[in-house]
UniProtKB/Swiss-Prot annotation:
NCBIfam families: coaD_prev_kdtB, cyt_tran_rel. It comes from the Bacteria. One of its GO terms (biological process) is coenzyme A biosynthetic process. This is Phosphopantetheine adenylyltransferase. Its cofactor is Mg(2+). It is an enzyme of class 2 (transferase). Its EC number is 2.7.7.3. GO terms for cellular component: cytoplasm. The lineage of its organism: Bacteria, Pseudomonadati, Thermodesulfobacteriota, Desulfuromonadia, Geobacterales. ATP binds at S11, F12, H19, G90, L91, R92, E100, Y125, S126, Y127, L128, S129, S130, S131.
């Protein structure tokens, strides 16, 4: 029986406990999840792509079922190249749905053989975003409970603490 593979794309700048929640729960459904870090030159990232990948790998540890990769170009092309058939997207609130719905419909118009699975973030992380974490951290606010210790350490280094 072929492996059920899903791709979980995002900028992960930085990865949060909300992202990890989606990965953990996604692994209950899929044999393998590829965490695909988008290389987006238009986005002003705090962490360069290689640092984001290293942080995600450190946080995921020795997971044989979660792989970290990077991609450019059309997501559906990348998903197909990986032998996956599903894109996982996390939703925090209704406000996320409209944008994600548009992306899913666009992907569907490009190819019929890749599905998008929306997963609601668990309640403790329903407000959490990488942007909020970066803002709170930049103002020297508490981010324990929002990101893993390795990410907090990396943020502290970025903000000279």
């Amino acid at each position: 029986m072929p492996l059920k593979i899903a791709v979980y794309p995002g900028s992960f700048d930085p990865i949060t406990y909300g992202h990890l929640d989606i990965i953990e729960r996604g692994l209950r459904i899929f044999d393998k999840i590829i965490v695909a870090v988008a290389k987006n030159s238009e986005k002003n990232s705090l962490f360069p792509t290689d640092e984001r990948i290293a942080l995600i790998k450190e946080v995921l540890g020795d997971s044989e079922r979660a792989e970290v990769d990077t991609f450019t170009g059309l997501l559906v092309d990348y998903v197909r190249d990986q032998g996956a058939t599903v894109i996982i997207r996390g939703l925090r609130a209704v406000s996320d749905f409209e944008y994600e719905f548009q992306l899913a419909q666009m992907n569907r118009s490009i190819t019929q053989d890749i599905e998008t699975l929306f997963m609601m973030t668990s309640v403790p992380y329903s407000y959490l975003s990488s942007s909020i974490v970066k803002e709170v951290s930049s103002l020297n606010g508490p981010i324990e409970g929002l990101v893993p210790p390795a990410v907090k350490k990396a943020l502290d280094a970025k903000f000279n603490r």
